[in-house]
């Protein structure tokens, strides 16, 4: 076996059974990985110098093909209602077959770290058969300095072989695609998919399993910090504005997607960003756009024209087009990936039912309730006319990546909020003046003004009213914001229609939360919404 690149000679691929590879390229730089990816026909260069790759059949994650090994250690620790088990025996066969499949191949290795706080970091070795996957994960995780590579010892190994096709009967999985996590032995196997995001989210899943046992809260969130050290955390599902609203030129970006909250404060799990690019423009998101125009960035499933210029408005391959770049490509990004304890937590929702106010203050019990609910709403396409919004509840704002029971994360979050006196807000970036189809999208200018007031502490000084449906505190008036949007009911022409819509949404919340009732205390149960129709 030929070996190239800096690495720890005591921890070679033979230690995980990959000694039969034809060659191994350890910790190659971006330039070297560009050369390899283009030489092998995996990717092509854009006019501006980014590397574009197409993932084929899978243009997003495959949550139905993700499995966790159910063994003596994980049996009582994992939330099996939400995580699919695979037996140790099936996993062993899958592992052996994947190792055999890798024999004779050129492989790429990156030795990286998940977690910017040293005491909670996860040294991770990622073995890939694609050079562009190696560049992707090099961009996304934290890179140790060169001197540290010669003594690097991984605690997690990911083996990523897109050309391997699983056999459901033989391997105990669902299809030819498989993502299998052995949490006890620190091994993740990915086969049958070229979508690079599976690697990133596998690291997140493992950290979400390991950290709560150490009293550290893992979070699917973005985070930033002000000039006075006032950190803020932004929870939110896809499409709620998590990346957009945390990108604030007046504040330093800590990270855009995954963080931990320890006894020392918050820290990024990653060293890069994986941003959506569909309809990306220099005007709306100049910093993210700029990363797509330079060497080192990976563009995933972005359409190029004949001149190799990216067309970010073309979603013909997928709406889930992405770019992956190192954190230091963003001008105001944190160099450490760390900050103190958050002063503010923002929970984002895009309420397409038009019921929720643009901002509401949450008590710790209400914060835990809405964290466990993880609500937003999807809207369908309008080709066949307006359709009903669809409520989406993804507990902890990231159910697919949470191996433990949601109550573990919720109780830890509530305890940290109380201990550090964190102010929590629910921010609705969805619809006002009616539901999707009749109302309009919440003005981004108003959202930014309300957010700025919340982060500065100004919002805490205004008069509040209790929301008649959800019980949380809503500001009556805020300087610089049109007062009419603060009371959603008043923005609807048909008040009875608003009341009916509110009752419908509240009933969805209650039905969804039923599965958590026995796992939370009375204070959180009492934070549930209840309809009280307002006077005309």
From Swiss-Prot:
Cofactor: Mn(2+)
GO molecular function, one term: ATP binding
GO (cellular component) term, any one: cytosol
An individual GO BP term: gluconeogenesis
UniProt keyword annotations, A-Z: ATP-binding, Cytoplasm, Decarboxylase, Gluconeogenesis, Lyase, Manganese, Metal-binding, Nucleotide-binding
Catalytic reactions of this protein: oxaloacetate + ATP = phosphoenolpyruvate + ADP + CO2
Pathway: Carbohydrate biosynthesis; gluconeogenesis
Residues annotated for ATP binding in this entry: 201, 220, 236-244, 285, 322, 447
Main localization of the protein described in the UniProt heading: cytoplasm
InterPro entries: PEP_carboxykinase_ATP, PEP_carboxykinase_C, PEP_carboxykinase_N, PEPCK_ATP_CS
Location in the cell: Cytoplasm
The enzyme's E.C. designation: 4.1.1.49
Keyword hit for tRNA processing: no
Task performed by this protein: Involved in the gluconeogenesis. Catalyzes the conversion of oxaloacetate (OAA) to phosphoenolpyruvate (PEP) through direct phosphoryl transfer between the nucleoside triphosphate and OAA.
Protein name as catalogued: Phosphoenolpyruvate carboxykinase (ATP)
Gene responsible for this protein: pckA
């Amino acid at each position: 076996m030929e070996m190239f690149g800096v690495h720890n000679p005591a921890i070679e691929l033979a230690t995980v059974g990959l000694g039969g590879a034809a060659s191994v390229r350890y910790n190659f730089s971006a330039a070297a990985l560009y050369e390899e990816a283009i030489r092998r026909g995996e990717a092509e260069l854009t006019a501006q110098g980014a590397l574009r790759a197409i993932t084929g059949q899978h243009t997003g994650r495959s949550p139905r093909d993700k499995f966790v090994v159910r063994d003596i250690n994980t049996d009582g620790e994992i939330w099996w209602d939400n995580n699919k088990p695979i037996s140790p025996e099936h996993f062993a066969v899958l592992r052996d077959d994947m190792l055999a499949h890798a024999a004779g191949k050129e492989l790429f290795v990156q030795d990286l770290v998940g977690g910017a706080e040293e005491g909670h970091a996860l040294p991770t070795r990622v073995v890939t058969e694609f050079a562009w996957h190696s560049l992707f994960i090099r961009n996304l995780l934290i890179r140790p300095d060169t001197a540290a590579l010669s003594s690097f010892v991984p605690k997690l190994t990911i083996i990523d072989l897109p050309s391997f096709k699983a056999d459901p009967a033989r391997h105990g999985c669902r299809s030819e695609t498989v993502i299998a996590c052995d949490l006890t032995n620190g091994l993740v196997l990915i086969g049958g998919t070229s979508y690079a995001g599976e690697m990133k989210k596998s690291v997140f899943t493992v950290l979400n399993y390991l950290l709560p046992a150490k009293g550290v809260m893992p979070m699917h969130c973005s985070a930033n910090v002000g000039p006075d050290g006032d950190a803020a955390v932004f929870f939110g599902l896809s499409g709620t504005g998590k990346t957009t609203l945390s990108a604030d030129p007046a504040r330093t970006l800590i990270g855009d997607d995954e963080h931990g909250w320890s006894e020392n404060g918050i820290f990024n799990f990653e060293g890069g960003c994986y941003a959506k690019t569909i309809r990306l423009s220099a005007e709306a998101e100049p910093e993210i756009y700029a990363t797509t125009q330079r060497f080192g960035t990976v563009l995933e499933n972005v359409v190029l024209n004949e001149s190799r210029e990216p067309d970010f408005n073309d979603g013909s391959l997928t709406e889930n087009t992405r770019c992956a770049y190192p954190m230091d490509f963003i001008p105001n990004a944190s160099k450490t990936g760390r900050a103190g304890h958050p002063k503010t937590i923002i929970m984002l929702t895009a309420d397409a039912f038009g019921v929720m106010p643009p901002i509401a203050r949450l008590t710790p019990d209400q914060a835990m309730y809405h964290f466990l609910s993880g609500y937003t709403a999807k809207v369908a396409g309008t080709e066949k006319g307006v359709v009903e919004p669809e409520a989406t509840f993804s507990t902890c704002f990231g159910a697919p990546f949470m191996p433990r029971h949601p109550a573990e994360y919720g109780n830890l979050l509530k305890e940290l909020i109380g201990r550090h006196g964190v102010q929590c807000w629910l921010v609705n970036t969805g619809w006002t003046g009616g539901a999707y189809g009749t109302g309009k999208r919440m003005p981004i200018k108003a959202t930014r003004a309300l957010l700025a007031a919340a982060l500065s502490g100004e919002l805490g000084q205004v008069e509040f009213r209790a929301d008649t449906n959800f019980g949380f505190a809503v500001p009556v008036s805020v300087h610089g914001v049109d007062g009419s949007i603060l009371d959603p009911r008043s923005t609807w022409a048909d008040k009875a229609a608003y009341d009916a819509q509110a009752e419908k949404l509240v009933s969805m919340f209650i039905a969804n939360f039923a599965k958590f009732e026995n796992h939370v205390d009375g204070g959180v149960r009492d934070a549930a919404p209840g309809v009280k129709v307002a006077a005309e």
